[in-house]
Amino acid sequence: MAKKDKTSVKKSVKETASKKGAIEKPSKSKKITKEAAKEIAKQSSKTDVSPKKSKKEAKRASSPEPSKKSVKKQKKSKKKEESSSESESESSSSESESSSSESESSSSESESSSSESSSSESEEEVIVKTEEKKESSSESSSSSESEEEEEAVVKIEEKKESSSDSSSESSSSESESESSSSESEEEEEVVEKTEEKKEGSSESSSDSESSSDSSSESGDSDSSSDSESESSSEDEKKRKAEPASEERPAKITKPSQDSNETCTVFVGRLSWNVDDQWLGQEFEEYGTIVGARVIMDGQSGRSKGYGYVDFETPEAAKAAVAANGTKEIDGRMVNLDLSNPRPANPQPYAQQRAGNFGDQLSEPSDTVFVGNLSFNATEDDLSTAFGGCGDIQSIRLPTDPQSGRLKGFGYVTFSDIDSAKKCVEMNGHFIAGRPCRLDFSTPRTGGGSRGGRGGFGGRGGFGGRGGFGGGRGRGRGGARSGNPNRGSVAPFSGNKVTFD
């Protein structure tokens, strides 16, 4: 009965294997299986890679690439089949336990045969694995997915056959059946691990191919995808760097000082005690001072209560104006503000004045009249201003006899007329902060300085009516004092008109 059960089990196992698409293995002789395995190994080593590629490419073209979901479903089906094969092996091992008491001679023969079959199967699996590694290294990542599926199916079928053979041939003892089952479990674990690794590598390679769009069929798809991803990242960096370089602002250059910026500060609400030197000392802390002047009244000689401070740079002038509202001089809070800048070309000022007052140039002479002079101007200021025009013979600045202050004009005498003409061309030049009016001076006429014959005598005492008035009028008083009828009344002459 036991033998009948064994034969029925073998038939059922073979039927299940044929239904699932497994390859039926002849069990007549074990030597035939060894020779067949060797022939398969030789044929696989002799075959070239190119026909495999062509077959696989044809398969790939005919059948679409399996998706990840289909691969997972196949894994689940594989696990189910493996579990069913294990259950069959366990049932066969239990049957072998019941039949272990038949004969010891058959057990020894079955031991040798089982060991030979297990060794032959292990050799076949090693050969298949080496071939798979070679194929995976030489073939592209896209074709590796379809190959792995086929190899996985072949392995499962081989395992089923080995499990069925071991179950049919392990009728010797319990220990042998346990060893075969443990070996089959270990092999299944190894195969599962290798399949998982291959699936992970194939998935990563397919991802890299989709990102890099490479059509190469080499096995180093990962390295190619890495290189392409690096090149793409470098291109992106370059693209980002190009607009950044274009958007870079140009180097900031310091703005040149505008010629219209003023360096003069107006100072208001000054005390009458403040003079030029005092005013300059009060503003030395803000920058280099070129000049300082307090505006004075020409008649009284007293300060008008304001002045000007000239700095070397506009920045110093702005710093001084920033102290407005906090600056005190001689106990008084002063007002500070920027003065109107001097025009670079003073000619418009001279032309405007000439249009307003009808100024006309006099006949050329060697003496130049300088009008609109500041009361603070000195002979040195005029010498510095007009020294470049020619050789200066003399400089005169008339003063008031009562106050001793300047009258606001002067005279500059040159050695020749050409130098004087050059000086007049500087009409509107600033001296001590004021634009000067330049003209040729007319020469003096004689006979009028002391009033002619009327001079210092006559009944008018000290020149009579002609007196000092004649001197100032350039002879007008002298002409009047020279009247032959000195002090007498002129006789009446004319027609007498009466009205009736």
From Swiss-Prot:
Encoding gene, per UniProt annotation: gar2
Record field: compositional bias (Low complexity): 90-120, 164-182, 202-218
Modified residue annotations for Phosphoserine: S143, S144, S146
Organism of provenance: Schizosaccharomyces pombe (strain 972 / ATCC 24843)
Comp. bias intervals (Basic and acidic residues): 1-41, 59-68, 126-137, 152-163, 191-201, 234-250
Molecular function GO labels: histone chaperone activity; RNA binding
Transmembrane regions listed in the UniProt entry: none
Domain RRM per the UniProt entry, residue ranges: 263-341, 366-443
Lineage: superkingdom: Eukaryota
Pfam families in UniProt: RRM_1 (PF00076)
One Gene Ontology cellular component annotation held by this UniProt entry: nucleolus
Family statement drawn from the similarity comment of this UniProt entry: Belongs to the RRM GAR family.
Function: Helps the assembly of pre-ribosomal particles containing 18S rRNA.
Gene Ontology terms describing biological process: chromatin remodeling; rRNA metabolic process; rRNA processing
Family annotation (SUPFAM superfamilies): RNA-binding domain, RBD
Extent of Acidic residues compositional bias: 219-233
Name of this chain's protein: Protein gar2
Ranges annotated as biased composition (Gly residues): 445-480
Gene3D superfamilies from the UniProt entry: 3.30.70.330
UniProt xrefs under CDD domains: RRM2_gar2
Alphabetized UniProt keyword annotations: Nucleus, Phosphoprotein, Repeat, Ribosome biogenesis, RNA-binding, rRNA processing
